[in-house]
Structures are given as structure tokens and as C-alpha cells.
Amino acid sequence: MAKKTLILYYSWSGNTKKLAEKIHDQIEDSDLKAVEVADGTFDDDQYKTNDIALDQIQANSFPDIKLDNVDFNKYDLILIGSPVWSGYPATPIKTLLDQMQGYNGEIASFYTSAGANRKAYVNHFKEWVNDLNVVDVAENDSKIDEWVK
């Protein structure tokens, strides 16, 4: 029997959203929710957004997120999608992970990347989860079948 799965994602340009929707279509009875931030949190320019995110990381001051009230513990598995920004998950993901502390199920992350710092993403994601149970991190949807079994 497949695990009860929630797919959460943050998408700045739309690439991660497309991948999250594809994964949602692959997993029967999964739920899909977007993590959003207030308008003006980031710039329309990719490089300026990257600089804003690095400033947030350095200051340990992460953006507030908008997410419907979610009972994380009703899910066996939560998949978290993010773009890679300078080797880090997008900073709204840090806020999400902080809100998820106490979740007892499994977490896996998928990411979209223009090419650089993929290994750093895995390390930073695992640092940001604290005591949450991360089972895997993968680029795109390559391991979905393994995760939901």
C-alpha cells in the first residue's frame, strides 16, 4: 500500500511547480500544496533574488511563508520541492522545515537546478531539517517510486 503523501513545494520561476505537479500526478491520492511568500520578498531578477537569499541565510532571518493550515502528522511521507539557490534550498523552505519540527513521518526532497551546487543542496537541506527524518534527497523525480512504497 502506498504511503499517504503530501507534496510541498516552493517555486520562484515555475520549474519546481511543474515538477511538483508531475510528481503529484504520479502518486495516487497525494496532496499538493504550494509554499508561498509575500509579494516583494524576492526580486523578479534571478541574481538579485539569489543575493537576497544569501543575505537571509547569513542573517539567519528567513521569510515568512503562506501555507494553508496543514496537519503534517496525517501523512506518512512529505516530499519537499525547491529550486537550488547557491547550493541552498530556497529560503522559504527553511521556514517550512522549522514549522514542521515535531513531524514524525518521513521526508524526502526533490529539487530543480540550473546546474551548480547540487551536492551542497543535499548537505544544506539535511542541516536545515534538524531532527526530522530525511530518507532521501534527489534531483527531479528519479526516486519517487522508491519513496512512496
Question: Language-model segments: which ranges?
Answer:
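Glycine-rich, N-terminal phosphate-binding loop of Rossmann-like dinucleotide-binding domains
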Residues: 82-83
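N-terminal beta1-alpha1-beta2 submodule of the flavodoxin-like/Rossmannoid cofactor-binding fold
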Residues: 1-78, 87-89, 98, 131-134, ...
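Alpha-helix N-cap/helix-start motif
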Residues: 89-90, 118
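A short helix->loop->beta-strand "cap" motif at the edges of active sites that frequently abuts
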Residues: 102-106
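Short, glycine-/small-residue-rich phosphate/pyrophosphate-handling segment
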Residues: 108-143
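Short alpha-helix in the alpha/beta-hydrolase fold that links the catalytic acid
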Residues: 92-97, 121-124
